[in-house]
C-alpha cells in the first residue's frame, strides 16, 4: 500500500480521524503536498469499494474518500492544525473535521489538544476531543488528560477513521520522577504513579486503574 504509506505521518493524530486500512484496493488516487501562505498542506482523494474492509456492505458500489490536513508551525515548535476526513458512499457522507494543537508555553510546560465534530449515521453525541497539559523536564514528567467521546462518534468516524470506543468521559494522569544516585552500586531510581478512570456520558463507571511503580537501575561496576 505505497500510496498510503508514503506521508502517512501527515495525517497522524491521537484520535484517528483517518485510518488508511479502512480503504481497500484503489483504482486511482491523487495526492497534494505543499505550502499555502505559510500553512503546510496535505491532501488526498481516492476511490474504493468499501466492502473490501467492511463485510456488512454489499460488493459493487465504490465510495470516494477525501482527506485534508492544514498545519501552521511557529518558531518555538508549537503548531496548530485542521484535519478533515470524509467518505461519500451511496447518497451519504461519514467523517469528521477536527482542530489540533501542540503548544509549548515554556521549555517545560506544554499542551496538546484535539476537538472534533463528526457526521454520518448518528446525529447526536457527535463531538469528541481531548486536552492534555503537561510538564516535562530532564528528570520529571507530569500530565493530566481529559477525553470526551460522544455516543455517536464511533459510527460516524469509523467508515474512514478508527475509534475503538465511544460514549465515554475519561480522565488520566501520570507522574514520574527520576533520581540519579550514582553510588552504592545504584545508577538511578525512578518512581511513577499512573491513574486512569472513565465513565459513560451518563456518569456510569466503566473502568478505573491505579498503577504505582518503582525501578532501580544498577551500575555496571560496583
Regions found by a protein language model. Give the residues of each.
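Conserved structural-core and active-site-/substrate-pathway-adjacent residues in large, well-folded domains
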Residues: 32, 43, 70, 98-101, ...
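Surface-exposed extracellular loop regions of Gram-negative outer-membrane beta-barrel proteins
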Residues: 65-119, 181, 185-195
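Exposed, low-structure sequence patches enriched in small/polar residues
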Residues: 113-222
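Outer-membrane beta-barrel translocator/receptor signature
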Residues: 25-26, 37-41, 52-54, 60-66, ...
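Secondary-structure transition into beta-strands, especially the periplasmic turns and strand N-termini
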Residues: 36-40, 78, 109, 137-140, ...
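Residues that define the transmembrane beta-barrel architecture of outer-membrane proteins
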Residues: 24-28, 35, 61-66, 93-97, ...
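Residues that cap or anchor secondary-structure elements
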Residues: 1-34, 40-43
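Extracellular loop and loop/strand-boundary signature of outer-membrane beta-barrel proteins
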Residues: 16-17, 48, 52-57, 85-87, ...
Amino acid at each position: 500500500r505505497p500510496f498510503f504509506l508514503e506521508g502517512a505521518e501527515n495525517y497522524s493524530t491521537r484520535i484517528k480521524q483517518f485510518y488508511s486500512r479502512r480503504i481497500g484496493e484503489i483504482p486511482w488516487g491523487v495526492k497534494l503536498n505543499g505550502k499555502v501562505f505559510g500553512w503546510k498542506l496535505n491532501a488526498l482523494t481516492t476511490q474504493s469499494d468499501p466492502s473490501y474492509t467492511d463485510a456488512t456492505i454489499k460488493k459493487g458500489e465504490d465510495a470516494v474518500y477525501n482527506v485534508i490536513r492544514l498545519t501552521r508551525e511557529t518558531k518555538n515548535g508549537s503548531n496548530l492544525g485542521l484535519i478533515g476526513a470524509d467518505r461519500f458512499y451511496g447518497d451519504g457522507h461519514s467523517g469528521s473535521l477536527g482542530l489540533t494543537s501542540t503548544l509549548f508555553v515554556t521549555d517545560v510546560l506544554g499542551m496538546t489538544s484535539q476537538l472534533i465534530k463528526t457526521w454520518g449515521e448518528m446525529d447526536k453525541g457527535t463531538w469528541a476531543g481531548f486536552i492534555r497539559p503537561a510538564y516535562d523536564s530532564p528528570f520529571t514528567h507530569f500530565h493530566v488528560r481529559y477525553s470526551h467521546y460522544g455516543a455517536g462518534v464511533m459510527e460516524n468516524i469509523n467508515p474512514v477513521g478508527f475509534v475503538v470506543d465511544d460514549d465515554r468521559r475519561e480522565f488520566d494522569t501520570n507522574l514520574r520522577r527520576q533520581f540519579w544516585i550514582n553510588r552504592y552500586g545504584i545508577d538511578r531510581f525512578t518512581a511513577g504513579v499512573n491513574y486512569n478512570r472513565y465513565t459513560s456520558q451518563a456518569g456510569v463507571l466503566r473502568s478505573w486503574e491505579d498503577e504505582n511503580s518503582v525501578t532501580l537501575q544498577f551500575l555496571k561496576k560496583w
